[in-house]
Amino acid sequence: MENLKKALLEQFDLVFSDETLLETAFTHTSYANEHRLLKISHNERLEFLGDAVLQLIISEYLYTKYPKRPEGDLSKLRSMIVREESLAGFARDCQFDQFIKLGRGEEKSGGRNRDTILGDLFEAFLGALLLDKGVEAVKSFLYQVMIPKVEAGDFERVTDYKTKLQELLQINGDVEIAYQVVSETGPAHAKNFEVAVLINGRKSGQGQGRSKKLAEQEAAKNAFEKESSSCF
């Protein structure tokens, strides 16, 4: 905790009044489950709160920044900014991956590098910051960490692999592409979906994500890479 507090102070000039909130934000369910007798809180509830305030602040920013863009374009851009992969990247930028508390099994299986865990951690931190400092503090933090990348156009260039896969396969004539949910795990506010992509009934790729759309994109990316190598 001391190293985390030092990092937040040095990087963002942040000092939490309620250190319990900060500790909870960095505690994964696997760690809490391994220490049940200590009745340690995990970060899922804070993640739920952080997701909501993140959506609000990014939505307000995009609405103000791009007054002539239609709702559909704004929604697509927002989804790219707040998707699991992006949030995990922001968590790594902030070096949050160094401080999360994981259970031994999760640690051994590579949980510290898993996008799902890091994306959830980033949202949980925002939830803790909201409760401790208020919405303006969250906004200030996001404007330091996220907005510069948005303004640099990083999320305008995100590849739509579902479209790329369709275009690749249609070179050889009509094909049937279907996306099938393989599994759905986690609590209602933090679902994790696993989706397979079928090409003419043949499984070609699989992906995971916090929404069906994100999982479909990951599956399409996996399939696109396989089909590209077999076509050329």
Curated annotation (Swiss-Prot):
Q: Give residue spans, biased composition: Basic and acidic residues.
A: 213-232
Q: Which GO terms describe its cellular component?
A: cytoplasm
Q: Where does Mg(2+) bind?
A: E47, D120, E123
DRBM domain span: 160-229
Q: Which InterPro entries does the record match to this protein? A: dsRBD_dom, RNase_III, RNase_III_dom, RNase_III_sf
Predominant place of localization: cytoplasm
Keywords assigned by UniProt? Cytoplasm, Endonuclease, Hydrolase, Magnesium, Metal-binding, mRNA processing, Nuclease, RNA-binding, rRNA processing, rRNA-binding, tRNA processing
Pfam families referenced in this protein's UniProt entry, alphabetically: dsrm, Ribonucleas_3_3
Q: Which cofactor does it need?
A: Mg(2+)
* Top enzyme class: hydrolase
Q: Name the chemical reaction catalysed here.
A: Endonucleolytic cleavage to 5'-phosphomonoester
Residue segments, region Disordered: 203-232
Q: Which SUPFAM superfamilies match?
A: dsRNA-binding domain-like, RNase III domain-like
EC no. given is: 3.1.26.3
Tell me one GO molecular function of this protein. metal ion binding
- Which stretches make up the RNase III domain? 5-134
| NCBIfam families in the cross-refs | RNaseIII (TIGR02191)
- Record text on subunit structure and interactions: Homodimer.
Q: What this chain does, per the record?
A: Digests double-stranded RNA. Involved in the processing of primary rRNA transcript to yield the immediate precursors to the large and small rRNAs (23S and 16S). Processes some mRNAs, and tRNAs when they are encoded in the rRNA operon. Processes pre-crRNA and tracrRNA of type II CRISPR loci if present in the organism.
**Know the name of this protein?**
Ribonuclease 3
List the taxonomic lineage. Bacteria, Bacillati, Bacillota, Bacilli, Lactobacillales
Write the gene name: rnc
